[in-house]
Curated annotation (Swiss-Prot):
<comment type="pathway">
    <text>Carbohydrate degradation; glycolysis; pyruvate from D-glyceraldehyde 3-phosphate: step 3/5.</text>
</comment>
<dbReference type="InterPro" id="IPR029033">
    <property type="entry name" value="His_PPase_superfam"/>
</dbReference>
<dbReference type="Pfam" id="PF00300">
    <property type="entry name" value="His_Phos_1"/>
</dbReference>
<keyword id="KW-0324">Glycolysis</keyword>
<feature type="binding site">
    <location>
        <position position="97"/>
    </location>
    <ligand>
        <name>substrate</name>
    </ligand>
</feature>
<comment type="similarity">
    <text>Belongs to the phosphoglycerate mutase family. BPG-dependent PGAM subfamily.</text>
</comment>
<feature type="binding site">
    <location>
        <begin position="86"/>
        <end position="89"/>
    </location>
    <ligand>
        <name>substrate</name>
    </ligand>
</feature>
<feature type="active site" description="Proton donor/acceptor">
    <location>
        <position position="86"/>
    </location>
</feature>
<feature type="binding site">
    <location>
        <begin position="7"/>
        <end position="14"/>
    </location>
    <ligand>
        <name>substrate</name>
    </ligand>
</feature>
<feature type="binding site">
    <location>
        <begin position="20"/>
        <end position="21"/>
    </location>
    <ligand>
        <name>substrate</name>
    </ligand>
</feature>
<dbReference type="GO" id="GO:0006094">
    <property type="term" value="P:gluconeogenesis"/>
</dbReference>
<feature type="active site" description="Tele-phosphohistidine intermediate">
    <location>
        <position position="8"/>
    </location>
</feature>
<comment type="function">
    <text>Catalyzes the interconversion of 2-phosphoglycerate and 3-phosphoglycerate.</text>
</comment>
<feature type="binding site">
    <location>
        <begin position="113"/>
        <end position="114"/>
    </location>
    <ligand>
        <name>substrate</name>
    </ligand>
</feature>
<keyword id="KW-0413">Isomerase</keyword>
<dbReference type="GO" id="GO:0004619">
    <property type="term" value="F:phosphoglycerate mutase activity"/>
</dbReference>
<dbReference type="InterPro" id="IPR005952">
    <property type="entry name" value="Phosphogly_mut1"/>
</dbReference>
């Protein structure tokens, strides 16, 4: 079976160099073109998907829709989960990355962004970016609502959905596409390829580029793209 992972196309806040996290930012015009290009590439590879998964965030949802439209596969089932959302950047969400580095120092911002288990400062529950005020997360328990996540935290959030849903589709011998985010996809890739905590920090995923894995029904990875 084929498992295709794709990071959403460039978003408006990627373009503005801002921490995005769970903020529901749209694709930029370039991001839409990246998604179209990805769909054409996958169509040229003669890939046919049986099921798709994505997050609750429109930049990933729209990327998936554009890809499937280019492939003439908009009819397949699509499942959305908050567990595939981007890493929550806490109080940093909405801030310009360069300005944040000037305020806190390059070293501190680098630690927040690139360490495995250090989370950024927690978001204030009165902030406009606090997820619980968004109705799509209204049914989540307070304990499931992140105030800020490290990559380790993101992995702990993502993997239960892999085990409960995505992997089951592969075991049913279905071809699967997952459109999500840089850190939620790093979580899946780390697990699939057994990448160390140190090495995963060096994995940078390009926006809008499909990554094709071949996986057997026992969930063994038979082939994977060159990632580093």
């Amino acid at each position: 079976m084929k498992l295709v992972l794709i990071r959403h196309g460039e978003s408006a806040w990627n373009l503005e160099n801002r921490f995005t996290g769970w903020k529901d930012v749209d694709l930029s015009p370039k991001g839409m073109e990246e998604a179209k290009s990805a769909g054409k590439i996958l169509k040229e590879m003669n890939l046919v998907f049986d099921v798709a998964y994505t997050s609750y965030l429109k930049r990933a949802i729209k990327t998936l829709n554009i890809v499937l439209e280019e492939m003439d596969e908009l009819y397949i089932p699509v499942y959305k989960s908050w567990r595939l959302n981007e890493r929550h950047y806490g109080a940093l969400q909405g801030l310009n990355k360069a300005e944040t580095a000037k305020k806190y120092g390059d070293e501190q911002v680098h630690i927040w962004r690139r360490s495995f288990d250090v989370a950024p400062p927690s978001i204030d529950k009165n902030s406009e970016y606090y997820p619980k005020s968004d109705r799509r997360y209204a049914d989540l328990a307070d304990s499931d609502i992140p105030l800020g996540e490290s990559l380790k935290d993101t992995i702990a959030r993502v993997l239960p959905y892999w085990h409960s849903d995505i992997s089951k589709s592969l075991q049913e011998e279905k071809n699967v596409i997952v459109a999500a985010h840089g850190n939620s996809l790093r979580a899946l890739i780390k697990y699939l390829l057994n990448i160390s905590n140190e090495d995963i920090l060096n994995l940078n995923l390009v926006t809008g580029k499909p990554m094709v894995f071949e996986i057997d029904k026992d969930l063994k990875v038979l082939s994977s793209p060159e990632l580093f």
